[in-house]
Amino acid sequence: MMNEDNKKVPKRISQTILNSLKGGVVPRIGLPYITVGRKNEIEALLHDVDIIAEGGASFRFIVGRYGSGKSFLIQTIRNYVMDKGFIVADADLSPERRLQGTRGQGLATYRELIGNLSTKTKPEGGALTLVLDRWINSVQTQAVQETGLEPGNPMLTKAVDQRIYAVTSAVSELVHGLEFARVLSLYYHAYVDGEDEMKMKVVRWFRGEYGTKREAKEALGVNIIITDDDWYEYLKLFAAFFRMAGYAGMMV
């Protein structure tokens, strides 16, 4: 529920809410303006959020009849946790998108989740590139503040490289972390060198869009791709990386 002194809904948000409700779907933004009677459920789920923010994990089933408000509650929590600095990923399961499969169904779920990555500043999905760029910018800013060096100074570049390496080294200790860290490093160097084409190749790999190892090898020099067998491990790698990048956690 909104505070008494903050009732006015911005026009862009109000239009999004109305269009979604007309179409019979839950709005992805602006839900606090129309949420009522969910205090107990929200508090229970936000307790889980606090656990995640402290480095723990949580898993919930929300069960109810058709039309009872399950999707509405999930989207409400989605908005709450983004305001708390979390990254959120969501996907609807279907015969083509499953938690497990041998014909691309698991990978399809992963692709949907990564494609729908959302943050407070990009709540409607597609936030992966934004998150990666923000991470690099924050590392550069931190290095400037701590060293007092001016941008362009070779010593500053070295200091940034060391901080980037610290993150990639920590990630590399996890399952498939070595490959993940290598691709993360490729993105960083492409960002610094202004190589937009290489950045997009890296993003394609993170999204699980390379169909063969040969294709990934030719594009990035890595001999591994994300598949049905290991996509969940990469989801865990992203969760660990997001924490290191300064976010409160990841909620799927």
What are these regions (language model features)?
Residues 1-58, 156-157:
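A short, basic N-terminal segment
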